């Protein structure tokens, strides 16, 4: 099993949707663009958002176990994926890439 690098590539915010539909929340997404985590195989990195992990974990698991080439050639690098979290008000796009380093 391999380690997988997770990089926050883009964070978007839709204030109009938040104003119209969302109840105010105390601790909204604190992810910053450029932030990097490394998943030790299938394990969620410490401090990584639980909700975002629910969205990306199937792809992390596949990459960690040597899989890839999602959706028949979707990504230029077959050992990678670009996956967004499921927050419709402030989605974050994460670039996932399998590393050559073995998980511990």
Question: What are the roles of these predicted feature ranges?
Answer:
Residues 3, 36-38, 91-93:
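Intrinsic-disorder/low-complexity, polar/charged segments enriched in Ser/Thr/Lys/Arg/Asp/Glu/Gln
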Residues 44-55:
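Short, Lys/Arg- and Gly-enriched loop/turn segments at beta-strand edges
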Residues 1-3, 30-33, 101-103:
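A short, structured loop/turn motif at beta-sheet edges
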Residues 17, 51-52, 59:
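Catalytic cores and adjacent flexible loops of soluble metabolic enzymes
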Residues 13-19, 46, 102-104:
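Short, surface-exposed beta-strand/loop "edge" segments at domain boundaries and coil↔beta transitions
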